[in-house]
C-alpha cells in the first residue's frame, strides 16, 4: 500500500510540475504578463539603449503653477494648526 501511495504522490507531483512548466514556459502568455518579465524587458531595453523615457519639460516662466491634491493641502493645514496649538500650550510653561 505504501508503494502505491508513494507512486501516486510522485505521479501527482510530477504532473503538476509538468503542467506548470508547460503553461509558464512553453505556452508563454502567462509568463509574459508577469511583473518579472516586464521588469526584465525594461532592464534589457535600458542596457541596449532602446529604452524610451517620457520626459516632462518644466516651464521656465515665473508663472508656473504647482497643483497639489486636496488631501495634501488639508494635511498641511491640519499640521499647521496642531503646531500652533502645541506652541500655545508650551508657551504657558515659559
UniProtKB/Swiss-Prot annotation:
Primary location group: mitochondrion
Membrane association type: Single-pass membrane protein
Cysteine pairs bridged by disulfides in the record: none
Localization per record: Mitochondrion inner membrane
A GO cellular component entry from the record: mitochondrial crista junction
Coiled coil feature spans: none
Key words of the record: Membrane, Mitochondrion, Mitochondrion inner membrane, Transmembrane, Transmembrane helix
One Pfam short name: AIM5
Record flagged with keyword Membrane: yes
Any one Gene Ontology BP term: cristae formation
Statement: the UniProt record of this protein carries the keyword Cytoplasm: no
Organism superkingdom: Eukaryota
TM spans (from-to): 4-26
Stated family: Belongs to the MICOS complex subunit Mic12 family.
Role played: Component of the MICOS complex, a large protein complex of the mitochondrial inner membrane that plays crucial roles in the maintenance of crista junctions, inner membrane architecture, and formation of contact sites to the outer membrane.
Complex and partners: Component of the mitochondrial contact site and cristae organizing system (MICOS) complex.
Name recorded for this polypeptide: MICOS complex subunit MIC12
Gene expressing this chain: AIM5
Amino acid at each position: 500500500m505504501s508503494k502505491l501511495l508513494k507512486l501516486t504522490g510522485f505521479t501527482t507531483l510530477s504532473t503538476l510540475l509538468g503542467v506548470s512548466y508547460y503553461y509558464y514556459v512553453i505556452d508563454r502568455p502567462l509568463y509574459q504578463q508577469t511583473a518579472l518579465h516586464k521588469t526584465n524587458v525594461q532592464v534589457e531595453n535600458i542596457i541596449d539603449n532602446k529604452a524610451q523615457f517620457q520626459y516632462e519639460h518644466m516651464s521656465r516662466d515665473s508663472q508656473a503653477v504647482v497643483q497639489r491634491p486636496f488631501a495634501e493641502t488639508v494635511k498641511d493645514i491640519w499640521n499647521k494648526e496642531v503646531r500652533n496649538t502645541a506652541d500655545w500650550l508650551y508657551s504657558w510653561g515659559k
